[in-house]
Curated annotation (Swiss-Prot):
This is Undecaprenyl-diphosphatase. Coiled coil: none annotated. Belongs to the UppP family. The gene is uppP. It comes from the Bacteria. InterPro entries: UppP (IPR003824).
């Protein structure tokens, strides 16, 4: 396989890994990176979905101790069962709404104005959330969340169906606005990502299975590997970062990126559509 093509796959994997779990929208960045690299045909869209697997593996690795302890304790400890139930409850709203509205959203909302607007609006929402009263925090750990907390975060996650919103951004900032600490909101967002990304990925790959080929296996393997490594580094960095910093820098970045979306769409350089 062409070395240049494999290099492009590596770059796309890094972009996916670095942006999947930051509140900046991986989809928007993959579209822009694909346009820059000339890696934006139908097969590239399937590739973008497939390399999310690497990011999922990274989260599982970072949180493996918690996941393992929960699985072992499920038969005997109510606390473990409640945590697992919370993840399931948070996951279900996105499943239901995706099945009902997924096609309509892809057909009508993937436009430059919508993508740019959600980037910019999301930036201002982050600024607002970070300036809320310190006393608003009532949940310091994911283990202290109630099923209602999980349901609310799950409903907020549905906003990520709108292009440019960012799944991690919606769940983290939504969780903070609902009273979760920055750490608890981030942790739950990452746990929620595991079933959400697996479900969305399997469903999308099944629909586009006619575009898959064994000949592309090296391409997908390279992208997945680089996605895994970069996502692992990014998640570990973010967990350290949030202990002493806010999400404000990401807010300004989103606003700036929204302007980039409008500029590239206006010049015709990037096709922000399905």
């Amino acid at each position: 396989m062409d070395f240049i093509l494999l290099a492009k796959a590596a770059v796309m994997g890094v972009v996916e890994g670095l942006t999947e779990f930051l509140p900046v929208s991986s989809t928007g960045h993959l579209i822009l990176a694909g346009a820059l690299l000339g890696f934006d045909d139908d097969k590239a869209k399937v590739f973008d979905i497939a390399i999310q697997t690497g990011a999922i593996f990274a989260v599982v690795l970072v949180y493996w101790q918690k996941i393992r302890e929960t699985l072992v304790a499920l038969p005997t400890q109510p606390r473990a069962r409640r945590f697992a139930l919370n993840v399931l409850i948070g996951f279900l709203p996105a499943v239901v709404l995706a099945l009902i509205f997924g096609k309509a959203i892809k057909a009508h909302l993937f436009t430059p104005v919508v993508v740019a607007s959600t980037f910019i609006l999301g930036g201002f929402v982050i600024l607002w959330a970070e300036r809320r009263a310190p006393g608003a925090v009532r949940v310091d750990s994911v283990d202290d969340m109630t099923p209602l907390d999980a349901l609310k975060v799950g409903l907020v996650q549905c906003l990520a169906m709108v292009p440019g919103t960012s799944r991690s951004g919606a769940t983290i900032i939504g969780g903070m606005l609902l009273g979760l600490s920055r750490k608890a909101a981030t942790d739950f967002s990452f746990f929620l990502a595991i079933p959400t990304l697996i479900g969305a990925g399997v469903y999308s790959l099944y629909k586009e299975r006619h575009l898959l080929s064994m000949a592309d296996l090296p391409l997908f393997a390279v992208g997945l590997l680089f996605s895994f490594v970069s996502a692992w580094l990014c998640v570990r960095w973010l967990l350290r970062y949030i202990s002493t910093h806010s999400f404000v820098p990401f807010a300004y970045y989103r606003i700036a990126f929204g302007i980039v979306v409008l500029a590239t769409a206006w010049t015709g350089w990037v096709h922000w559509g399905e």
